[in-house]
């Protein structure tokens, strides 16, 4: 537990030992929470932790498979941030071993971002590589019969590198509430679709594809009237993100606009 706490800069409770399994063990009631906010936590009823011997041998590093069951991810937006004092201590220590963590969410697990209003279920795979502090994820999100959102991302912590793919063939936004920036926005109706890719590196930043909102009706906090739009589209052209909105309406004002 102490080693994992030092690695993650979080409070760690591995829970109860349940028993041995092939090339691993099963733990019960495991949880990880933030040191500054214990209500921001990740927990699971059962967790299988095992070594992947053949891949470990071929790649010459420890590859660990972690499969949580009945997991709940209830975190705030700062959960993955680390104190500067912690970063300075880590930077002075040379990592002695290379390893790879493979998180397998085979069944849908609850995901909630406390201060963003986002609540959904996710399943998929997340890989963490210690050698370059890389995170690779391929996840599918289920919004309780309102539709699905698939996203892939690849990033290297503390480096200027990010790849993001976002896909949905139709996500119903009716009666959803989110916090964007510091403002609460109530989606009274609308549909979100996406086939969007974003890539960023130290040498280049570009995007591909598009995403859109149709039949949109929202009520931002502190706004007197609803904002309505038949169609608002964001699409990439010549490495620019262009916005096109049709019949945008606020109160008595109705217009069409384009932004580049």
Model-derived features with residue positions:
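Amphipathic hydrophobic-ligand
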Residues: 10-11, 36-51, 80, 87, ...
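Transmembrane beta-strands of outer-membrane beta-barrel pores
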Residues: 70, 107, 143, 170-172, ...
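Short, exposed beta-strand/loop patches in secreted or surface proteins that constitute
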Residues: 16-18, 125-130, 153-157, 232-235, ...
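Gram-negative outer-membrane beta-barrel proteins
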Residues: 74-76, 109-111, 147, 172-176, ...
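Sec-dependent signal peptide cleavage junction
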Residues: 2, 87-90
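Short, hydrophobic/aromatic-rich segments at coil-to-beta transitions
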Residues: 100-104, 130-139, 237-244
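Flexible beta-edge/linker motif
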Residues: 10-11, 15-82, 89-111, 149-154, ...
């Amino acid at each position: 537990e102490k080693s994992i706490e030092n690695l993650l800069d979080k409070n760690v409770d591995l829970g109860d030992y349940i028993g041995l399994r092939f090339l691993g063990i099963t733990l019960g009631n495991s949880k990880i929470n933030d040191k500054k906010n214990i209500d921001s936590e990740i927990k699971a009823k059962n967790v299988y932790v095992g070594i992947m011997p053949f891949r470990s041998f071929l790649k010459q590093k420890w590859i660990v498979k972690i499969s949580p069951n009945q997991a709940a991810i209830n975190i705030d937006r700062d959960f993955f941030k680390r104190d500067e004092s912690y970063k300075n201590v880590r930077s002075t220590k040379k990592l002695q071993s290379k390893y790879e963590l493979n998180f397998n969410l085979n069944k849908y697990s609850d995901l909630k971002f406390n201060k963003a209003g986002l609540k959904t279920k996710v399943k998929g795979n997340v890989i963490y590589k210690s050698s370059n502090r890389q995170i690779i994820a391929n996840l599918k999100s289920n919004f309780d019969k309102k539709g699905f959102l698939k996203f892939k991302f690849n990033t290297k912590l503390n480096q200027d590198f990010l790849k993001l793919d976002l896909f949905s063939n139709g996500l119903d936004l009716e009666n959803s509430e989110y916090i964007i920036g510091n403002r609460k926005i109530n989606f009274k109706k609308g549909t979100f679709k996406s086939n969007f890719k974003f890539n960023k590196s130290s040498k280049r930043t570009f995007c591909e594809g598009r995403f859109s909102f149709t039949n949109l009706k929202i009520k931002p906090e502190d706004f007197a009237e609803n904002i309505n739009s038949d169609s608002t589209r964001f699409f990439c052209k010549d490495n620019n993100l262009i916005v096109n909105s049709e019949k945008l309406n606020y109160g008595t004002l109705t217009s069409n606009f384009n932004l580049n």
